[in-house]
Amino acid sequence: MLSILWNLAAFIIALGVLITVHEFGHFWVARRCGVRVERFSIGFGKALWRRTDRYGTEYVIALIPLGGYVKMLDERAEPVAPELRRHAFNNKTVGQRAAIIAAGPVANFIFAIFAYWLVFIIGVPGVRPVIGEITPNSIAAQAQIAPGTELKAVDGIETPDWDAVRLQLVSKIGDQQTTVSVAPFGSDQRQDKTLDLRHWAFEPDKQDPVSSLGIRPRGPQIEPVLSEVQANSAASKAGLQAGDRIVKVDGQPLTQWMKFVTFVRDNPGKPLALEIERQGSALSLTLTPDTKSVNGKAEGFAGVVPKIIPLPEEYKTIRQYGPFSAILEATDKTWQLMKLTVSMLGKLITGDVKLNNLSGPISIAQGAGMSAEFGVIYYLMFLALISVNLGIINLFPLPVLDGGHLLFLAIEKLKGGPVSERVQDFSYRIGSILLVLLMGLALFNDFSRL
């Protein structure tokens, strides 16, 4: 319950910030163009708070925080007094109206740059993309990429950490192949390797793009050495102690902790013959895992904690810049996200990305809560990502979105007169139906993931 409330709070804050930014873009440019703004509302429905400024603009925070709007004086909506007609939106030039409409998405892009600027000034921790293991017969194995090498670039784009690698790999969905530059860790002697992506079975909502290629990042090492044995557990009853190294299980040599976990999990209530090393001496013990029900299935449980060797400092990175350099980095990062978003939307349309990858408010709320738990840096990066998505989606040429209004203005400019109200009304209805269908699909996908 607490996690749901946390996710909801983080989601509402994120939505409030991004909607305010978007609508403020419309509001600010409208004011600059001499348009009278009658209402600036965050949310829909019953007003929870309102005030009116000296220009006659009413500011509202409403009950349902799923959007917002800026209401401008417009003769098409209601009669306007003669002395105020020059302040009506419909009486402004095509260029001014286009600027007002485009200002919302542009404000979202500027906010993303600002958020990343803060992130890069604070400093972004990361891990150098050094490969720990390669899965046999995987795409990475077929490209002859070796463990211990570092991924320096993907298709010529530098990848200083794993997040950068993931961002570039996601953009390759639907492509036939991609080229990665690798080098031994600590060296810059690069080699180019070609990844064959024709049979890349990657689903963004379920998998990590790196692991789906058969690459396991170098991380903290988990040794088959016990750091803790829980009291009254199966391991304690078997005589295991902290510091014991497990050498063999049922006669099979053990070099990886996960292999021991698999043995225990798959043998509930069954004796396992262990050979261990304790303070230089070899011992033989018998472990009978306790039985626990997990999702209706019996699994073994030993009650031990392994020894974890932290990642060495030379594998860690921090991207931190001065105020001016941070602007350049933030702009570049935002541009990369914009290109990725457009690419992914295009691949949704062409079918290269499945429609079940479309996410709705529930997935966004979960992302908001998770990023907020990790800290302010990750929450800012989440806000930047959603802000870019909001800006791009609003530029789609659907009549109910900013992009649709811009399309009508472009037609008006070309033909020398506005699109007829009949055509506009029909287009709005079609656009509304399409938008509702997309939202319904996104919600269906959200619920199917729960």
UniProtKB/Swiss-Prot annotation:
It is a multi-pass membrane protein. The chain crosses the membrane at residues 1-21, 104-124, 376-396, 430-450. Its EC number is 3.4.24.-. Zn(2+) binds at residues 22, 26. GO terms for biological process: cellular stress response to acid chemical; proteolysis; response to temperature stimulus. InterPro entries: PDZ, PDZ_6, PDZ_sf, Pept_M50_Zn, Peptidase_M50. One of its GO terms (molecular function) is metal ion binding. Disruption phenotype: Not essential. Normal levels of sigma-E function at pH 7.0, loss of acid stress induction of sigma-E. 100-fold decreased survival in acidified murine macrophages. The active site is at residue 23. It is an enzyme of class 3 (hydrolase). Its cofactor is Zn(2+). Residues 22-103, 397-429 are periplasmic. It is found in: Cell inner membrane. Pfam families: PDZ_6 (PF17820), Peptidase_M50 (PF02163). Keywords: Cell inner membrane, Cell membrane, Hydrolase, Membrane, Metal-binding, Metalloprotease, Protease, Repeat, Stress response, Transmembrane, Transmembrane helix, Virulence, Zinc. One of its GO terms (cellular component) is plasma membrane. Residues 125-375 are cytoplasmic. The keyword Nuclease does not apply. A site-2 regulated intramembrane protease that cleaves the peptide bond between 'Ala-108' and 'Cys-109' in the transmembrane region of RseA. Part of a regulated intramembrane proteolysis (RIP) cascade. Acts on DegS-cleaved RseA to release the cytoplasmic domain of RseA. This provides the cell with sigma-E (RpoE) activity through the proteolysis of RseA. Deletion of the PDZ domains leads to dis-inhibition of protease activity and almost complete loss of RseA even under non-inducing conditions. Belongs to the peptidase M50B family. This is Regulator of sigma-E protease RseP.
